[in-house]
A protein has these predicted regions:
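Active-site neighborhood of phospho(di)ester-bond hydrolases with catalytic His/Asp-centered motifs
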Residues: 67-71, 91-100, 120-123, 185-189, ...
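C-terminal regulatory/interaction regions
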Residues: 2-24, 273-320
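Metallo-beta-lactamase
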Residues: 21-24, 123-181
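Active-site metal-binding motif and surrounding structural segment of the metallo-beta-lactamase
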Residues: 63-64, 73-121
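Metal-dependent catalytic neighborhoods of phosphoester/phosphodiester hydrolases
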Residues: 105-115, 130-133, 272-279
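Cap/insert and terminal regions of metallo-dependent hydrolase folds
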Residues: 195-295
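Conserved catalytic scaffold of divalent metal-dependent phosphoesterases
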Residues: 157-162, 166-167, 176-184, 190-192, ...
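Conserved beta-strand hairpin/beta-sheet module of binuclear metal-dependent hydrolase folds
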Residues: 2-84, 171-189, 206
């Protein structure tokens, strides 16, 4: 299951009466990675918690991992990591997009301190972290690494380039992770996709971006009107249509047909459905083959991130 070389590219589920999870959602323990490379696995994504693992494996089979958001409690995070073949000993850093409770659980503090995991977040979010209950040990042990929008290195071999995005009062952070094996773009909880984000993610090999809601389901939902107004606003979340448009713009701005993989995050359980997402993205038959839909309860398979090979002039047959 974990070897993406033998798996089909990335498929959406077919609609069923029971709304079964997508085929690329798995729950069996992962096999140990031995080939050097870059891979990504979403442990779960939605309003009930968000956590994504980016894994680097060297030629000796040694692994290091970085978490993008940490929105599950200690037990669930530990279990999900184990299920994906990752232990806390592999986790070197947590990179937070923002501090909503579905993206960071302060109860993880003890595990982060025990395993000496650094927490990277924007200066705008630093005060909120400092006033979150139980997080003081992170500061006392020197594990908090605030950054201004720009570039930093969360762990050797990974360079993070950041951009601030509009979401609620303090915004959220979009990350581009660059390694010798390829680049990953990651953005969630953004009300719209500005031009700077399109440029920021141009050329990434894997794109993780939210596809939160179906607009019609949202306007017809029983949620309070102020919640719907917030989600639909430029400071809320991306709809399926907005996500599709953002992906197409990033593809247009990218060379060599990138991104090779598109991972859709943070699908609303009340105001979205896999079939709604699929109907939007199947407009492009080539794009839908590259798409993985995430799930709140179950992780995705490991997605191996490999840059698309550049076509050399010697390989081209020029029309005369």
């Amino acid at each position: 299951m974990e070897s993406v070389q033998s798996a089909q590219p990335l498929l959406f589920p077919q609609p069923t009466a029971g709304d079964l999870p997508p085929r690329d959602i798995v729950h069996k323990p992962a096999r140990r990675a031995t080939r050097p490379g870059l891979s990504v696995c979403v442990l779960g994504s939605g309003s009930g918690g968000n956590c994504t693992v980016v894994r680097l494996t060297d030629a000796k089979g040694q692994r290091e991992a970085v978490l993008l958001d940490a929105g599950f409690g200690v037990r669930r995070t530990t279990a999900k990591l184990h299920e994906a073949g990752i232990g806390w000993r592999h986790v070197k850093a947590v990179m937070l997009t923002h501090l909503d409770r579905d993206h960071f659980k302060p109860s993880l503090t003890r595990a982060l301190v025990e395993h000496r995991v650094t927490v990277h977040l924007h200066h705008w979010h630093l005060d909120e972290l400092a006033h979150s209950r139980g997080t003081q040990p992170l500061f006392e042990h020197g594990l908090v690494e605030p950054f201004n929008t720009g570039i930093f290195v969360p762990t050797p071999g990974v360079t993070a380039t950041t951009t601030r995005l509009q979401h609620d009062r303090q915004g959220t952070i979009g990350y581009r992770l660059s390694t010798r094996f390829g680049d990953i773009g990651f953005a969630t909880d953004l009300g719209h996709a500005p031009r700077k984000l399109i440029e920021h993610f141009a050329g990434v090999d894997a794109l993780c971006i939210e596809s939160n809601y179906d607009e019609r389901m949202t306007t017809q939902s029983s949620r309070p009107s102020f919640v719907n107004r917030r989600n639909l606003s430029d400071s809320g979340h991306l709809s399926n249509e907005q996500a599709y448009e953002a992906v197409q713009q990033i593809r247009d701005a990218s060379p060599h047909g990138n991104p090779r993989h598109v991972v859709l995050l943070h699908r609303s359980s009340q105001c979205n459905h896999p079939t709604k997402v699929r109907r939007v993205f199947e407009r492009d038959p080539q794009l839908i083959k590259r798409v993985t839909m995430t799930d709140q309860r179950k992780r995705t398979r490991w997605i191996n991130v490999k840059p698309l090979r550049q076509v050399h002039r010697s390989q081209l047959t020029l029309a005369r």
